[in-house]
């Protein structure tokens, strides 16, 4: 029979105690919180260059005079996705004078959430090739945009930016 080494037995015992310990003094590894990204453009620039452009495409596609065959469904999908992605940009702020203030307000976040929900609705309508659902999504998008503009952007245009629509 082999004789066990007292040093090895002690090492195993200490290791087991450490493994079964209370965890005090153990450093937890948590994912690092990313530093918030702030765009090098203003929220208004995002609205004019991306949101307005995408929303108008959806509104034009949802025109009741169109037939489902006439609608460019893949383009509607692309514009709905652009709107969904823009929602994130609308919550991060930017270089505009009011951007930092807007993104902290619950009303602002509510309007962004409404825009996002309408955009997801438009995306689903496009994927289903459903003109009626696209019209409903367009109406909801108008409601979120107009409500937000009335509260946060009563004087159009701001920052000297204009859109072609």
Residue positions per predicted region:
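Bacterial N-terminal signal peptides that target proteins for export
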Residues: 1-10
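Extended hydrophobic/aromatic-rich secondary-structure runs
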Residues: 4, 21-24
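Sequence context surrounding c-type heme c attachment/ligation sites in exported
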Residues: 23-165
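C-terminal motif of bacterial Sec signal peptides marking the signal peptidase cleavage site
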Residues: 17-19
């Amino acid at each position: 029979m082999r004789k066990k080494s007292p040093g090895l037995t002690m090492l195993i015992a200490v290791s087991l105690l450490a493994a079964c310990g209370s965890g005090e003094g153990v450093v937890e590894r948590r994912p690092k919180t990313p530093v918030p990204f702030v765009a090098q453009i203003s929220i208004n620039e995002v609205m004019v260059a991306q949101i307005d452009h995408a929303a108008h495409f959806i509104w034009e596609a949802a025109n009741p005079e169109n037939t489902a065959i006439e609608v460019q469904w893949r383009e509607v999908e692309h514009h709905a996705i652009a709107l969904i992605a823009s929602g994130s940009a609308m919550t991060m702020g930017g270089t505009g004078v009011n951007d930092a203030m807007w993104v902290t307000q619950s009303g602002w976040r509510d309007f962004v959430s409404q825009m996002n929900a309408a955009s997801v609705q438009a995306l689903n309508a496009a994927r289903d090739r459903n003109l009626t659902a696209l019209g409903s999504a367009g109406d909801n998008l108008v409601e979120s945009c107009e409500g937000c503009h009335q509260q946060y952007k009563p004087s159009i245009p701001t920052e000297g930016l204009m859109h072609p629509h």
